[in-house]
Amino acid sequence: MSTLNQAHCEACRADAPQVSEAELPELLKQIPDWNIEVRDGVMQLEKVFLFKNFKFALAFTNAVGEIAEAEGHHPGLLTEWGKVTVTWWSHSIKGLHRNDFIMAARTDGVASGAEGRK
């Protein structure tokens, strides 16, 4: 199990450091199925989760919402029929913070127990 999955988010201020190029490979090893996307110059973690139908996709979306609320760190969520795209990044620093990797790992934990996965 990923050590990130057991960690908690810390408060992220506008002057908090982004994940460094040196830290990036080690953190990505713990969430190997996530991709880095760059949108408008902002690095983001993204992963698509597939489900058997909309009901299961919506339940997963709500479960991710619950962990996001508990940690005070919120993703971009796109829920479609049979598919949820989850995107993590830290708005305040316009990039990736350790919190994003923690929440990606925790999202994987939610997905591992989610009903209706494809």
From Swiss-Prot:
Which reaction(s) are listed as its catalytic activity?
(4aS,6R)-4a-hydroxy-L-erythro-5,6,7,8-tetrahydrobiopterin = (6R)-L-erythro-6,7-dihydrobiopterin + H2O
Keywords from UniProt, A to Z, are: Lyase
**What's the superkingdom here?**
Bacteria
One biological process GO term for this chain?
tetrahydrobiopterin biosynthetic process
Q: Mind telling me which InterPro entries this protein's record contains?
A: PCD_sf, Pterin-4-alpha-carb_dehyd, Pterin_deHydtase
- One Pfam family from the UniProt entry? Pterin_4a
What's the Enzyme Commission number for this chain? 4.2.1.96
Return one GO MF term. 4-alpha-hydroxytetrahydrobiopterin dehydratase activity
Question: What family name appears in the similarity comment?
Answer: Belongs to the pterin-4-alpha-carbinolamine dehydratase family.
In its UniProt entry, what is this protein called?
A: Putative pterin-4-alpha-carbinolamine dehydratase
